[in-house]
Amino acid sequence: MKTFSAKPADVTHEWFVIDATDKVLGRVASEVALRLRGKHKAIYTPHVDTGDFIVIINAAQLRVTGAKSTDKIYYRHSGYPGGITATNFRDMQTKFPGRALEKAVKGMLPKGPLGYAMIKKLKVYGGAEHPHTAQQPKVLEIAGAAK
């Protein structure tokens, strides 16, 4: 019997919605990365995008454990000398809710064309509303509540 290898035309991408209220950032990010890659499916093939679409709502209410809200630092550089900027998690969540989650998930995905296609299937919204109701996403529960 030959080893099964999924073809891009044979893969169906489902839509899921996750409510991130009071969930821990890393636990949500790891589960989302696993589902974006498609590793939860029996037809997983490393060189084919077998993952699903993930819509995350209430990303502004994500939590981190310990003192990471002030200690976790995100860096970016403008490209000019001395152009490095540092932002902690609390300020990032205030200005751009959901960007910390996007960065965490992006770091867990492969780098290259396939990884870039996977991250495009992630939709993050700070509030409870999202424009993807036409896709009829299924509710996905993640056990990552902060204690």
Curated annotation (Swiss-Prot):
One of its GO terms (cellular component) is cytosolic large ribosomal subunit. One of its GO terms (molecular function) is mRNA binding. SUPFAM superfamilies: Ribosomal protein L13 (SSF52161). It holds the Pfam family Ribosomal_L13. Keywords: Ribonucleoprotein, Ribosomal protein. GO terms for biological process: negative regulation of translation; translation. The keyword Ribonucleoprotein applies. Gene3D superfamilies: Ribosomal protein L13. Part of the 50S ribosomal subunit. Belongs to the universal ribosomal protein uL13 family. This is Large ribosomal subunit protein uL13. It comes from Polaromonas naphthalenivorans (strain CJ2).
